[in-house]
Amino acid sequence: MADVYERSFPLNPAAYADKVLGGWLGKAIGGTLGAPCEGKKSKLSLNFYDPVPEGSVPNDDLDLQLVWLHALQTKGLNLTVNDLAKEWLAHITYPFDEYGVAIANLKKGLRPPISGSYNNFFSECMGSPIRSEIWGFISPAQPLAAMEYAFQD
């Protein structure tokens, strides 16, 4: 993946940090406030969050991106799909939908990308897109790098 990082561009560290913080906070707030509605397909009766939540609950939309940050901290920028699979097995415990099937497949010895699709009726769900922001956050002005990370994911 090294060739996708060779492009240089001017980067204002303060502006970059502000944009990442804004993106992360927006995702955290949206995930927290949207959690009670997740998966519901009927008309919603919202109470406008009275009282407003004071904290968050476990949220796969955020938690999985923290696992990817851990992978980056321990493995560096040249992550492989196998690095991500090891992190998945070590740190992801969500048993439902595509996550549970992928974990079971990895434990059976199936490797990516087969581990994510084999016998996985949920493989077209939103897990991957919903956790993709992290790749954009770490690849400012480098859409090809972000795309490569997302592909590995």
Task: Outline where the language-model segments fall.
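Structured, active/binding-site neighborhoods that engage oxygen-rich ligands
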Residues: M1-D153
